[in-house]
Amino acid sequence: MINTETFDTHTPMMQQYLRLKAQHPDILLFYRMGDFYELFYDDAKKAAKLLDISLTKRGQSAGNPIPMAGVPHHAVENYLAKLVQLGESVAICEQIGDPATSKGPVERKVVRIVTPGTVTDEALLQERQDNLLAAIWHDNQGFGYATLDVTSGRFQISEMIELETIAAELQRSRPVELLYPESFEHMALIENFHGLRRRPLWEFELDTAKQQLNLQFGTRDLVGFGVDKATLALRAAGCLLQYVKDTQRTALPHIRGITMERQQDTVIMDAATRRNLELTQNLSGSTDNTLASVLDLCVTPMGSRMLKRWLHAPVRDRQILENRQQAIATLQEIGLELQPFLLQIGDLERVLARLALRSARPRDLARMRHAFQQLPDIHQVMDSSDSPYIKQLQKNIGRFDELQELLEKAIVETPPVLIRDGGVIAPGYNSELDEWRTLADGASNYLEQLEIREREKLGLDTLKVGFNGVHGYYIQVSRGQSHLVPIHYVRRQTLKNAERYIIPELKEYEDKVLTSKGKSLAIEKALYEELFDLLLPHLAELQTSAEALAELDVLANLAERAETLNYICPTLSDKPGIQITGGRHPVVEQVLREPFISNPLSLSSQRRLLIITGPNMGGKSTYMRQAALITLLAYIGSFVPAEKAVIGPVDRIFTRVGASDDLASGRSTFMVEMTETANILHNATEQSLVLMDEIGRGTSTYDGLSLAWACAENLANRIKAMTLFATHYFELTTLPEKLEGVVNIHLDAVEHGDTIAFMHSVQEGAASKSYGLAVASLAGVPREVIKRARQKLKELESLSNHATASHVDTPQLALLTEETSPAVEALENLNPDSLTPRQALEWIYRLKDMV
């Protein structure tokens, strides 16, 4: 913390720094000094650690050196990118005054604030991932949640009651920056997120939020958006919008509306399901061998981002799904023609966001122009389709011939990175600019003529005319001939072997050229800003076009994937159940070297719960996951890896597949397993698809079997959910005899001596035996251990069979029975009523010895 008592002891420049820093106490301040951005005090220490840069010292504060660190201005974007990825925010303070005319420190001002959730610069963004800013609110009515993608203007809200539901939503949206009220009671829910920002309660005030939102959208109320009753979510949305306005410090015309996400509109998946199905991230945290890695060959970044949104929010609206199916079928014929043109569109969505924020760079406008140039070819290909949905997309894409012509006239073919570099506006666009440029560009001819004239007039063969950034134009003569220069040559600089002079004629020309360069750059900047004014009135149509182009890219990509990977169009049915013929796992079939064995799946009202048995490594988990992934693909409108698929109504997908210790939360494997199981039993419905893999294996045999049995009963009898229930408890294979709608299936395998061949083929009925020893042998367990295990297995099986035979009528299922103790046998044969007190005492000692 900076001591205000010592403020007057600082230099004027440091006083200026301290005033600016006081306005931004919680974030890093990049303070421009010449060619560097400097940081001081705790900011310097933090930046030195995070960026691995040198920590130095400058001046003194209360007798102690001031810590300082700095980064060069030309490389600032790289350092900002690193800080943003670490969840840090940075205030950028620039010199806005002229050092030449400033009395005291040059005037400085914070011109932008870079935060993880509000960045729009392409160098700071992951191009194929959404960059979401979020806000969360909680009170006794539930949770309100709002997300905004500043790079597209997509603004969404939702409301939830249960903690599990908001946890799943946070997992799905994965915001890079999260705003929460200072009174928030569920910190455990959000503590693992980067970019947490604690905000005062008044920023979540409901009336202020409504006022802010109406002001942003130019509306009197929020009824038209269907969000006026969502008071919890509106509190979060109001805080979020205010935060963006504070950081961007400019209008936000690309944020034109807000939508309410309702749970009944999508197939709900909790955090565990998203993780287990490896949609966009595998269990190791990378993107390899995920569903997205197989499906996403989109040619535009905005298409790739849209596809990932679809995967994480499958829709239940039949009309939307059938529109997509119809479009994919059409694009199988014309999609390959479209993709080369779509490839040239680039990331139009994010270019438009930068245009809206008036931060678009010259190359952004060139990219926009290039995108417009592709539209006639895209329309020509789409004209050949008679699909109503393709026609609707074509209408939304539109044409921007006038804007294309404007940018072709205004911007050079290959513009520089920044407008301050000049040379952005094309020749012929503005006559005044052309005149000033001609004056500046004519300098080289004039200087050549002056050099020839002066050299001949004075007879000095070493004379030459030049320019440098410090001293401007000069006439240079060697030291040996310097005594021959005329009196009107005024010395400007002395070098080791030469003298440099200025003459009135050259000075006059210098003033004119420098004026012309400054003037032409000023005109260019004004014309560039004017281009924004000409483009921004079309922002709404441009955003609609970008969204339609992104969707066209997704659909063309899914058409190519369907054609290449042999996917078929699933039938969406109102009848409960899932019927799949020749189903395949979309990811596993791509990474396997040998052919993938396809399998059927049949779930219906009469066949609700499948008990799946078979060897470890036999393919149970793959089979279960493939059922969920095929269902999910059908609910994003995609074709699916199968010979035939009929998919009935599905409201949720649950998975209880595999588990590991959650050490961070202090939960064991079994606790994780039971928490996920409890979530399923509380929230699954008759229309849910439930995958349960090896329930109860994390505890003792009796406990585990009892829990697995009770869970299966509950799912089959009470919930009646469509369930795939894999188990190693063979006792559960008797359930079909006791419960309606329960069926046994198994994954086949064939044993050859000590080896095993997995057939990966699903068959009706229970597995005939376990293959644990064969799998152990395959894993390399020593031969003598396998041999001993085989002997022990025979002993245990004979004991188990004997116990089963002698207790045929007992309801308890036979497990691995232990040999009866001699003490137990003695007690069974003992008649306590015939014993004297002394004999009873002797028997106690005798039984103790037996034990």
Curated annotation (Swiss-Prot):
ATP binds at residues 614-621. Keywords: ATP-binding, DNA damage, DNA repair, DNA-binding, Nucleotide-binding. This is DNA mismatch repair protein MutS. It comes from the Bacteria. One of its GO terms (biological process) is mismatch repair. The gene is mutS. Disulfide bonds: none annotated. The keyword DNA repair applies. InterPro entries: DNA_mismatch_repair_MutS, DNA_mismatch_repair_MutS-lik_N, DNA_mismatch_repair_MutS/MSH, DNA_mismatch_repair_MutS_C, DNA_mismatch_repair_MutS_clamp, DNA_mismatch_repair_MutS_core, DNA_mismatch_repair_MutS_N, DNA_mismatch_repair_MutS_sf. This protein is involved in the repair of mismatches in DNA. It is possible that it carries out the mismatch recognition step. This protein has a weak ATPase activity. Belongs to the DNA mismatch repair MutS family. One of its GO terms (cellular component) is cytosol. GO terms for molecular function: ATP binding; ATP-dependent DNA damage sensor activity; damaged DNA binding; mismatched DNA binding.
